[in-house]
Curated annotation (Swiss-Prot):
A cellular component term, taken from the record's GO annotations: extracellular region
UniProt name for this protein: Beta-defensin 104A
Disulfide bond residue pairs: 30-57, 37-51, 41-58
Family: Belongs to the beta-defensin family.
Domain of life: Eukaryota
Species in which this protein is naturally found: Hylobates lar (Lar gibbon)
Range of residues in the leader sequence: 1-22
InterPro entries associated with the record: Beta_defensin_dom (IPR025933)
Localization annotation: Secreted
Swiss-Prot/TrEMBL keywords: Antibiotic, Antimicrobial, Defensin, Disulfide bond, Secreted, Signal
Amino acid sequence: MRRLVLLLTISVLLYQDLPVRSEFEWDRICGYGTARCRNKCRSQEYRIGRCPNTFACCLRKWDESLLNSTKP
């Protein structure tokens, strides 16, 4: 009887899709290490592609004045 309960418990645990798996896929690094996988990009981010888990690969927007910084 104990074995039956143990086997039933193990099979129920293995059948469930554990939420830990989705936490690993959430906020994963993409874009050669410069972006993050998100369900939806934030307002200060650009969507640069798709992650393997079908989330958007979001890159943070940059300040253009920093890119053209030339000292006079």
